[in-house]
């Protein structure tokens, strides 16, 4: 998937370089995002009148957020600032970052998340390791269809530095035009 997406970008006239993710991304995903997402949910649902209708996964997340400590949230915010600095270094050398949109192939619609990815047990956010850090840093990103894997639709994400929204949007039509004509424009729903 990544190689094919990189080749498509090259065919569209872009230089593509492989680089390991900054270590700050993994630290963020492991230590900061669980705190930020659960406390954020607790904040948003302070006045929600239908908490009894939450899925069990969201109810658990809400309970963690309500039990969270301010010191944990401040530590998570410090990790976000470290990640922002690490990504600023990346964007000094590269215009955009290419990642998968998800760490997992599509899973059944009646399941809240995949239980395993690449043979490893994961929690409810295991599939989102490529998007959570982008959201927390407030960076623009574009999800693009990238074909099929094991007969399932998959995508890639292009992430840009702050203020690069127009660059990302301008790239989308060229990406779409380079799609394999056999790729359906709408994925069949089953």
Predicted regions mapped to residue ranges:
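Gly/Ser-rich, acidic/histidine-flanked active-site/gating loops
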Residues: 1-32, 66-68
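Short glycine-/acidic-enriched loop or helix-start segments at secondary-structure transitions
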Residues: 28, 107-110, 153, 168
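Short, surface-exposed loop/helix-turn segments at secondary-structure junctions
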Residues: 106-128
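Short helix-loop capping/hinge segments that flank enzyme active sites or metal/cofactor-binding pockets
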Residues: 35-88, 100, 104, 143-153
């Amino acid at each position: 998937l990544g190689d094919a997406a990189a080749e498509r970008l090259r065919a569209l006239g872009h230089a593509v370089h492989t680089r390991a993710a900054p270590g700050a991304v993994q630290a963020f995903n492991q230590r900061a995002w669980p705190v930020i997402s659960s406390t954020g949910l607790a904040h948003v649902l302070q006045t929600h009148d239908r908490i009894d209708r939450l899925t069990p996964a969201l109810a658990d997340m809400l309970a963690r957020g309500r039990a969270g400590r301010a010191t944990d949230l401040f530590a998570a915010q410090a990790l976000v600032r470290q990640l922002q600095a690490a990504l600023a270094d990346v964007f000094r050398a590269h215009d955009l970052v290419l990642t998968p949109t998800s760490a997992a192939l599509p899973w059944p619609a009646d399941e809240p998340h995949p239980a395993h990815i690449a043979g490893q047990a994961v929690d409810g956010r295991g599939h989102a390791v490529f998007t959570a850090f982008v959201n927390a840093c407030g960076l623009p990103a574009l999800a693009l269809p990238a074909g099929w894997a094991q007969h399932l639709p998959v995508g890639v994400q292009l992430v840009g530095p702050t203020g690069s929204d127009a660059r990302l949007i301008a790239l989308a039509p060229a990406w779409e035009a380079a799609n394999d004509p056999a790729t359906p424009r709408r994925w069949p729903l089953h």
